[in-house]
């Protein structure tokens, strides 16, 4: 699923920060106390657009890390400057030194990783004592009410039996060496995403019919036969608030 973000078509429909957005990233940085003296790591920075906006807004130094060579290539071409650097590396094994950041921002990267504890472990290593983690993630408010098709789709992304409720995220973050400062559901983010997804599906269905889009290439081959039903059920779940979004601010505990 991670490779989907580098597709030009995906970026055209959803933007560079999906399923988050730049406004939420700025808000998280404000709430997390980012300032011009901060050393911020943006884990899963994509093509660097949000990193550049945050750097300009707060005047801080940012190290952006992403596992996609294509996205890092775009970031280096479009945004690299003295206060903004980008490197391609796995999010759970970066080349950065221990305790090199006062703040770390990551947007939905835990949501789509089958072992988010590994990324949280790397985050703990990268942050200094009392460093601040600011992350935003997909949230399932009540999985028992979801349509079977939606649960299959979410299992494809999250893995089976993962608790992605607000409480589930809090428990996961705290279990990996962080103290939660604030956890907030961001319903307006998912409302905006629902509109984007609805518009995008018109184009995606056309491409699928004409052979221009292969779900297997996107890691969604298991949904090929029921794609329309899955999409419609997912849109309904978003309308009903069963699929939402959340933001979290936490402090690194001492090792």
Where are these regions (language model features)?
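Class I SAM-dependent methyltransferase SAM/SAH-binding core
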Residues: 47-93
């Amino acid at each position: 699923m991670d490779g989907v973000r580098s597709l030009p078509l995906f970026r055209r429909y959803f933007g560079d920060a999906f399923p988050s957005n730049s406004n939420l990233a700025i808000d998280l940085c404000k709430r997390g106390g980012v300032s011009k003296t901060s050393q911020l790591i943006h884990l899963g920075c994509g093509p660097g657009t949000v990193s550049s906006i945050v750097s300009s807004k707060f005047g801080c130094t940012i190290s952006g890390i992403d596992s996609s060579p294509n996205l890092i290539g775009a970031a280096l071409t479009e945004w690299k400057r003295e206060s903004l650097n980008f490197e391609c590396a796995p999010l759970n094994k970066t080349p950065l030194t221990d305790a090199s950041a006062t703040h770390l921002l990551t947007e939905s990267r835990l949501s789509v990783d089958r072992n988010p504890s590994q990324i949280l472990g790397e985050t703990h290593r990268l942050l200094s004592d009392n460093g601040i983690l600011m992350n935003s993630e997909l949230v399932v408010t009540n999985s028992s009410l979801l349509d079977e098709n939606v649960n299959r789709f979410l299992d494809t992304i999250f893995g089976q039996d993962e608790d992605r409720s607000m409480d589930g995220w809090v428990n996961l973050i705290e279990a990996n060496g962080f103290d939660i400062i604030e956890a907030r559901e961001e319903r307006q983010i998912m409302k905006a995403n629902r509109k984007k997804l609805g518009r995008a599906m018109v184009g995606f269905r056309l491409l699928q019919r004409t052979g221009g889009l292969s779900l297997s290439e996107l890691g969604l081959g298991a949904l090929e036969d029921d794609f329309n039903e899955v999409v419609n059920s997912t849109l309904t779940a978003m309308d009903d608030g069963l699929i939402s979004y959340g933001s979290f601010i936490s402090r690194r505990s001492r090792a």
